[in-house]
């Protein structure tokens, strides 16, 4: 089983000079700049001007004989709506991860669930080769769990979490309900909310 440290969406690419030893111990400034050139990662090639809330396949990675599918659970319109605050995102992360890890069908297929740095959504990594439509019921179920949750947020204690005070259940529930309006009417939009825009 792959662990949560497997984060392919980060797409880090090491320079070609990694591990390269020069006889002089030095390289020219021009060579250094050439060696440090990095490719744009896949997630930066998506047109965020056209991107709207939905469920998208971000990438698929082969790991040995297995496939890991990374999903973009986009909750807000990039650069149009206010981004989510860390407290509600943190709460959704705790609740979503708890839900997924305990799911009867996807618990052992869940590799990772966590927030995007831009704070417009979450990444969900599942072991298996999936399309957006395959997991739409799972995502709806998860956000219904967040929307309807009452009580103490799992893991919201100083022993269990490194920033346990940064939680906002009320806003997490509100945002989950807002996203569910998209998910439950996903086929009614003029543009696809299951495939990235061209």
Protein language model regions, located:
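Histidine-acidic residue clusters that define the catalytic metal-binding segment
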Residues: 181-198
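Non-catalytic terminal extensions that flank enzyme cores
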Residues: 34-79, 193-197
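Active/ligand-binding-proximal structured segments within catalytic/core domains
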Residues: 68-102, 112-113
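Active-site-adjacent, His/Asp/Glu-enriched structural segments that form or flank metal-binding
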Residues: 113-185
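Short secondary-structure junctions
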Residues: 103-107
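Short hydrophobic targeting helices and cationic amphipathic motifs
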Residues: 7-10, 15
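Short, Lys/Arg-enriched N-terminal segments with co-localized hydrophobic residues
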Residues: 20-37
């Amino acid at each position: 089983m792959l662990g949560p440290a497997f984060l392919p969406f980060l797409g880090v690419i090491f320079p070609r000079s990694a591990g390269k030893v020069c006889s002089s111990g030095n390289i020219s400034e021009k060579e250094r700049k050439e060696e440090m050139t990095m490719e744009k990662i896949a997630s930066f090639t998506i047109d965020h001007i056209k991107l709207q809330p939905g469920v998208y396949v971000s990438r698929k990675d082969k790991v040995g004989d297995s496939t890991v599918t990374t999903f973009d659970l986009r909750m807000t319109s990039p650069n149009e709506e206010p981004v989510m605050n860390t407290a509600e995102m943190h709460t959704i992360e705790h609740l979503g991860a708890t839900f997924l890890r305990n799911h009867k069908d996807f618990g052992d297929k869940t590799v990772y669930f966590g927030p995007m740095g831009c704070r417009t959504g979450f990444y969900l990594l599942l072991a298996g080769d999936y399309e957006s439509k395959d997991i739409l019921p799972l995502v709806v179920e998860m956000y219904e769990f967040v929307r309807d949750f009452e009580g103490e947020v799992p893991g919201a204690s100083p022993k269990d979490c490194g920033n346990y005070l940064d939680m906002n259940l009320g806003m997490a529930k509100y945002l989950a309900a807002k996203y569910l309006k998209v998910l439950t009417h996903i086929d009614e939009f003029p543009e696809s909310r299951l495939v990235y825009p061209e």
